[in-house]
Amino acid sequence: MKPKILLTNDDGITSTGLWAAYDALAPIADVTVVAPATQQSAVGRSISIFEPIRANQVTMNGVTAYSVGGKPTDAVIIGLFALRLNPDLVVSGVNIGENLSFESIMTSGTVGAALEAANQGVPSLAFSLQVEDQGDKFDDPSRIIDRYSDAKRVVRETCERVLANGFPGKAHVINVNIPARVRGGYEITRLAEKLFYTGVEERLDPRGRPYYWIDGPLYEDAEEGTDVHAVQRGNVSITPITLDCTAYAAADELKAIFDGMHI
C-alpha cells in the first residue's frame, strides 16, 4: 500500500508550485491536497482563531482537493483533525521563492505549515524554489510555469529517501531549498541568520502623509555551511529543523544571573 501524504502550501491552491509537487509525489504516494484558497505568503505559523474556517472540496487539474479559507497552518489542522487524513508525511510547497535562513523560516507560511504538522507529531518537509527575479514572489502563482523540472526531481527523490529510510530522529522538519539553476548536488546545511539586509522605504500618500515598505537587498556573502551559501553555489540545501528553540548553552549563565531572586 502506498504511503499517505498531505500536501499543502502558502501560495494558494492555484499555485503551479503546489501542483508540480503533486505531479512529483502522485506516482509514489496517495496524495491529498489541502491548501489555502488564496495567497498566504509570509503569514508564518499564524492561525485563525477569530473567524470560522471553511474547507471546500474542489476539483483542480482533474484531482479532488480541499480549498481552505484560512492560513497554511489552518489547512494542516483541517487536514489532520477535520478530514482525519492520518498522513505518513506532510509536504509543504513547492514555494515560489526561497525560504532560507532563520529570518525566513520564522515568517514563511510554507515552513509554518510544516512546523505545525511536526508539532502535531507528523514528520514534515518544506520545499522552496529560488527565484532569480524577486518580483516573481509577488506575481500570480498560477502563472509561474516552466521552471519545475529540477524541483520535481528533488521533491520526489527527497521524499522517497525519507519514506524508505525513516525521518531523522532528532529533527522535526526538513527544510529543502532548490536553486533556480541547479549546478551541484545535495548539501546538508545549517540555517544562516539572515537572507536580506533589512531596510525601510518611506513614501508619501497624496495627502503628504508617510507610509512605509519593508524591503532590502539579498545577502551576497553567506557563511560556508549555511543554507544561503549552498543555494548561492547552486546546491540543493537540506536543513534539519527542530521545534525546540531552547538555548541550552545559556542555561548556566542565566542561573548565575538570576540566582537568589525571589518574588
Curated annotation (Swiss-Prot):
Subcellular location: Cytoplasm
Annotated cofactor note: Binds 1 divalent metal cation per subunit.
Binding-site residues for a divalent metal cation, renumbered to this chain: 10-11, 41, 95
EC numbers for this chain: 3.1.3.5
Needed cofactors: a divalent metal cation
Coarse class of the protein's main subcellular location: cytoplasm
GO CC terms, sorted: cytoplasm
KW Cell membrane (keyword) present: no
GO molecular function terms attached to this record: 5'-nucleotidase activity; metal ion binding; nucleotide binding
Annotated NCBIfam families: PRK00346.2-1, surE
Stated family: Belongs to the SurE nucleotidase family.
Function: Nucleotidase that shows phosphatase activity on nucleoside 5'-monophosphates.
Protein's name according to its UniProt entry: 5'-nucleotidase SurE
Organism per entry: Methanoculleus marisnigri (strain ATCC 35101 / DSM 1498 / JR1)
Gene name for this UniProt entry: surE
